[in-house]
Amino acid sequence: MRFKDLAVGKYVILNRWLSKYSNLYCETLEIISTPDTKEENVVGCRRVTHDGCVCTNNKYADEKITYINYIHLREVDVDPYACLKWNKGDVLVPTEIGVDRLSKPQLNHSPYVVVEGTIWYDRYRDRNDLRVYIAPSDGGAYSMLLNVSYFKKDDNAWRGLFASQYYKNNIKFDENGELVKPTSVVKGSPVYNQILKEAKACGVVKE
């Protein structure tokens, strides 16, 4: 980050791996103090995620304040707490940070779909972490734990996702407009309803 962009309350992440802060490389931090001059260059930060997950009962992951030279920080371009409002079936796309951090195979499976969100209680820290699991929208079998700085919800992604999968014959409807492929999607589920909505919008299924 640049000095002029620093502000208390901004969310940041390390812009590269540093051995001194190796345990913070994948974590989102909040700036809680800024230097008065460029020469001081040290920013006070507190960690808001644990394993990339936010907490529902305590804003910070621990009591520690970490002081980092601001040149090693990068602003997080999404609200890390947006995931608290996500639902099963929501479509996620990588953020700019996600594009830089995710592996090529992981990026090739984008966009992703929210599979489930569970509360995991860490009794050592008295912290309830929201652990959101996501899976590739292309039918990949594996799911992975969401890092809140790596993905964002995209309401417009469904249209492109539907079109690409339909023309690859990964999505099929019968003559009555009922979804028959993929068979794993349950009728009436959020994903089923979203697919049907996009099919009608694209004229594949008639109203």
Set out the residue ranges of the language-model regions.
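N-terminal Sec-dependent export signals
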Residues: 9, 17, 23, 101-107, ...
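Short, Lys/Arg-enriched, disordered terminal segments
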Residues: 1-3, 207
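Basic/aromatic-rich interaction segments and small domains that mediate binding to polyanionic partners
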Residues: 18, 22-60, 102-148
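Small side chains
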Residues: 44-45, 92-94, 117, 195, ...
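Intrinsically disordered, low-complexity, charged/polar segments
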Residues: 50-87, 130-205
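Short coil-to-beta transition motif at edge beta-strands of beta-rich domains
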Residues: 4-17, 84-100
